[in-house]
Amino acid sequence: MIRRYYITLGAQTTAGGTVSSASHADSIDGVPIALEGDKVRCPACDAEGVIALDGQRLRETLDGREVALGDDLCLCGCSPPPRLLASQAIACQLIDAAQA
């Protein structure tokens, strides 16, 4: 099984960026869960990016948008795009390796 942890407000990217917006529809330990299209501030390129989905996942939406998971992308000015790093280890999706 592959574990992909949910991304929450304040999570970092591989380029040192920070998730700066998230849904208030659900939270983990009181911290809002980030969704596809939420904003990420990237200091590496000095731009504001957005979360884009990447990789295998179970379909799960809040407010009509897919939840963000660890290793999803930050679409900003960086090339290649930075990856999101989960800042919590409480909640994740378990994906069968055969599906990946």
Predicted regions and their residues:
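Intrinsically disordered, low-complexity proline/glycine-rich segments
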Residues: M1-A100
